[in-house]
């Protein structure tokens, strides 16, 4: 962690054709004779012709090929829809807390698709990179933190390149994820802060430039409502311009003021971004489980569940 200064079985009717042959004779016990021949034995010549037609030298090669195809289909059928899983969870939570009031993230109007695109900001937009190269690592870090110290609704960090590389390797392979954020639940019978609910947030990475990467956070409810035009409540920018010279990466983030996501909420989401994307390593059992859950989500594997996501996000173990 760096220090902050703000996605069936076929019923196989096996009829072994074990139709017993009754040789009935007066005064004798029926003898059951079972006849069973596998398709391969019965149609070996046809199977061999089919195998050769498909470019295989033997029936065994054909069987191995079909086995791989069948296993691939089974994996496809077993895939889950992660967003459907999340939707089911939200509906379940809503029903359980039907009489409760959640302090959920406010939904906003979608982005205007016709609006001109604003060029993304690079490190040079904030500091003169040319001049930074002549300064020591400590001086550069001080300048970066000072640049954001007096600004509201901001986050900033200086990240060791080794930590950044671990996180980016997972981000490039898994650019989309979801993370839970604890939310206060206030019911008619419960005092404020007595109960907690969970609100899910959509995490998306964008590699906008050779040395600039964005991580955007949007409530899942808003993403489902507006899709690609949903407004992120928090945007993190990573600048890797000084990796070779100083061995560090700068991060700055902005939390939109017109939502009820505050800087502390964004910090908690950022902490779990680091943990699930492997920034803290994958040495411990819990750390391995987090990164594996991220990969399960990307692969739409049944291994991903919202319950496991919440449990691992709340665990104090790293």
Swiss-Prot record:
Coiled coil: none annotated. It is found in: Mitochondrion. The modification Phosphoserine is found at residue 109. One of its GO terms (cellular component) is mitochondrion. Residues 1-40 form a transit peptide. Pfam families: ATP11. One of its GO terms (molecular function) is unfolded protein binding. One of its GO terms (biological process) is mitochondrial proton-transporting ATP synthase complex assembly. Keywords: Mitochondrion, Phosphoprotein, Transit peptide. PANTHER family: ATP SYNTHASE MITOCHONDRIAL F1 COMPLEX ASSEMBLY FACTOR 1 (PTHR13126:SF0), CHAPERONE ATP11 (PTHR13126). Belongs to the ATP11 family. Present with 2840 molecules/cell in log phase SD medium. Essential for the assembly of the mitochondrial F1-F0 complex. May interact with the alpha and/or beta subunits of F1-ATPase. This is Protein ATP11, mitochondrial. It comes from Saccharomyces cerevisiae (strain ATCC 204508 / S288c) (Baker's yeast).
């Amino acid at each position: 962690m760096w220090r902050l200064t703000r996605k069936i079985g076929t019923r196989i009717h096996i009829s072994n054709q074990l139709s017993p042959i009754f040789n009935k004779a007066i005064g004798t016990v029926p003898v059951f004779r079972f006849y069973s021949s596998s398709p391969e034995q019965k149609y070996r010549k046809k199977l061999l012709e089919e195998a050769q037609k498909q470019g295989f030298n033997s029936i065994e090669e054909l069987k191995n090929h079909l086995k791989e195809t069948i296993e691939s289909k089974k994996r496809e059928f077993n895939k889950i829809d992660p967003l459907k899983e999340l939707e089911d969870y939200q509906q379940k939570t809503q029903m359980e807390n039907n009489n409760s009031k959640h302090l959920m993230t406010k939904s906003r109007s979608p982005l205007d698709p016709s609006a001109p695109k604003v060029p993304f900001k690079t490190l040079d937009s904030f500091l003169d990179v040319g001049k930074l190269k002549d300064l020591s690592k400590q001086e550069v870090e001080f300048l970066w933190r000072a640049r954001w110290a007096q600004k509201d609704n901001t986050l900033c960090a200086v990240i060791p390149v080794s930590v950044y590389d671990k996180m980016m390797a997972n981000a490039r392979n898994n650019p989309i994820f979801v993370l839970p954020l604890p939310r206060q639940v206030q019911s008619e019978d419960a005092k404020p802060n007595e109960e907690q609910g969970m609100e899910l947030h959509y995490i998306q990475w964008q590699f906008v430039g050779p040395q600039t990467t964005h991580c955007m956070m949007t409530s899942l409810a808003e993403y489902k409502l507006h899709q690609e035009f949903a407004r992120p409540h928090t945007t993190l920018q990573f600048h890797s311009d000084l990796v070779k010279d100083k061995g560090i990466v700068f991060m700055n983030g902005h939390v939109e003021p017109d939502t009820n996501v505050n800087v502390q909420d964004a910090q908690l989401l950022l902490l779990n971004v680091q943990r699930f994307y492997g920034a803290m390593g994958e040495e411990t059992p819990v750390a391995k489980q987090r990164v594996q859950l991220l990969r399960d989500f990307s692969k739409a594997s049944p291994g991903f569940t919202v319950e496991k996501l919440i449990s691992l996000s709340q665990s104090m173990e790293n």
